[in-house]
């Protein structure tokens, strides 16, 4: 048994006309905005799960930083501190036929790709409490509670940031983006 499909100008024209009409006027912008909204939701969901678009879990925090963060903000996720998260600053922008999804956070790229942060040498004052017998405690205190200050110089150093990809398309995202585009091309936008 043989099946035959013939595509002629008569059969393809109505479908092409529908697709062209769907993208005329605001159609393309609306399609890109719908795709952008979906990608924002998917990216936030992945950030909450602390995983890359391919589903791999983010690398754990370095032991020293984990101790610090657990002491300061126990139970707060990897890319979250002071109740702000990289994911809280995700945005989408449609300009012409282009959709941009990302963040305006200056630290977004270093978390996405990893890398090295150079910290310059610096001098600062540290504050202690000196007892009446002249001994100085070994714990830092606030300037207000201090009666002994010492100037220290910290050398330059590097911080190695492990990549924790948060932006990108999973296989599920690709399928959903195609579905949204198909709906718009068929003249059935979701919005």
Region roles according to the model:
Residues 1-191:
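Short, Lys/Arg-rich flexible segments
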């Amino acid at each position: 048994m043989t099946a035959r499909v013939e595509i002629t100008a008569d059969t393809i024209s109505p479908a092409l006309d529908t697709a062209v009409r769907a993208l005329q006027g605001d159609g393309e912008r609306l399609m890109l905005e719908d795709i952008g909204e979906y990608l924002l939701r998917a990216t936030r969901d992945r950030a909450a799960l602390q995983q890359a678009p391919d589903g791999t879990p983010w690398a754990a925090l370095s032991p020293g930083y984990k101790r610090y963060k657990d002491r300061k903000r126990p139970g707060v996720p990897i890319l979250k501190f002071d109740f702000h998260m990289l994911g809280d600053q995700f945005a989408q922008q449609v300009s012409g036929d282009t959709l941009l999804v990302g963040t305006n956070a200056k630290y977004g790229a270093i978390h996405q790709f990893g890398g090295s942060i150079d910290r310059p040498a610096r001098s600062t004052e540290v504050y202690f409490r000196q007892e009446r017998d002249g001994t100085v405690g070994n714990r830092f205190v606030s300037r207000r509670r201090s009666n002994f200050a010492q100037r220290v110089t910290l050398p330059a150093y590097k911080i190695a940031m492990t990549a924790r990809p948060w932006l990108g398309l999973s296989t599920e995202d690709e399928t959903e983006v195609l579905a949204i585009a198909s709906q718009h091309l068929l003249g059935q936008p979701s919005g």
